[in-house]
Amino acid sequence: HAHEVARKLQALIDAGLAKLPAPGGGQTLERWQALARVGSQDLSLAKLFEGHTDALAIMRELGAPPMPPGSSWGMWAAEPPDAKVVFQPMNDAGESNAADGAHSVLLDGRKAWCSGAKSASHGLLTVWRSDGSGPFLARVAMAQPGVQVSTEGWLAIGMAASASVDVVFSSAKAQLVGPAGAYLNRPGFWHGGAGIAACWLGGAQTLADALYQATARAGSSEKNMLRQIALGKVDMALRHTAALLREAAVWIDAHPAADASLLALRVRLSAEASADVVLAETGRALGAAPFCKDAGFARMACDLPVYLRQSHAERDFASLGEGVAATGPQSWAL
């Protein structure tokens, strides 16, 4: 399945379908609709598609040189305490800067949670100076001797095809993108964070559709009432998240340079809660059959809980509450 996902991603890129509108440019909803569509088909594919399109948006926002035609990108920003990548300028190693004027560097260290690293042609990742300052962003071509993609450690069942493995860099050539802190401080950071909620919503919609189909086929009967109750709960949950995403997209397009952190936290937490409702209600209403006899349903039901763990759960609720306490509850009014 991992090879199939990589092939499908490349097909989307080659067909121009990964050239999504930039977030905050007036078509944010269209961007998120594309993410949701891919998510509804395959969440491992959505994970890689979202990373590729996020990397392109980041490099465009930070004024990076054009990407090679047909290239596929991973966006890797996880910073666990036991995995860090540091850089030194190439001219410190006796080499000149790149001809395109970018700051050429050498990367050393290990990067964790690199989704799609086995198939990506390039990576965009957070890196640090040897003195601990940063983070910076660096873009790196994967096909070079100084890049080693791990084949171990990824034991996931859900999201297995996203293959979020470790990558080890040993004097790998790369170029810095933007100044220190640019990745976290740019307005697009939270635009991208909100977009992940669209992927989750797409996956949840596919599971919900199975419940809808089963309920609609059975018609109105007392025996079907439990499915109808479940479908009502699922309908409310999905509509809640979809409405929040539409509202957030309009706001971001109207305020592209403003802080969208609270909006992003709301849509992510809403999408997570809605997906939890869908997972619970579809299982209770449909029983074991689709989990055991419908390969697409079974994979989606296995993938979605794993992808949702990209949420920070209660920590995000705390951040949202802190923000509301500081700015006020104006958005509660109609």
Regions found by a protein language model. Name each.
Residues A2, R7, H240-E272, A280-C292:
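C-terminal helix-coil-helix/basic helical segment that borders enzyme active sites and/or dimer interfaces
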Residues A2-S119:
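Glycine-rich flavin
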Residues A55, L107-G109, F169, A204, ...:
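Buried hydrophobic positions in well-ordered alpha/beta secondary-structure cores of metabolic enzymes
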Residues R110-Q144:
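DPxDG-like acidic metal-binding loop motif
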Residues L155-R239:
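Glycine-rich beta->alpha junctions and the first turn(s) of the following alpha-helix
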Residues G202, G232-R239, L265, L269-D276, ...:
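Generic structural signal for well-ordered, non-transmembrane alpha-helical segments
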Residues M225-G232, A258-R266, A295-A298:
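Short, charged, amphipathic alpha-helical segments
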Residues A289-L334:
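Glycine-rich phosphate/cofactor-binding loops in nucleotide/flavin-utilizing enzymes
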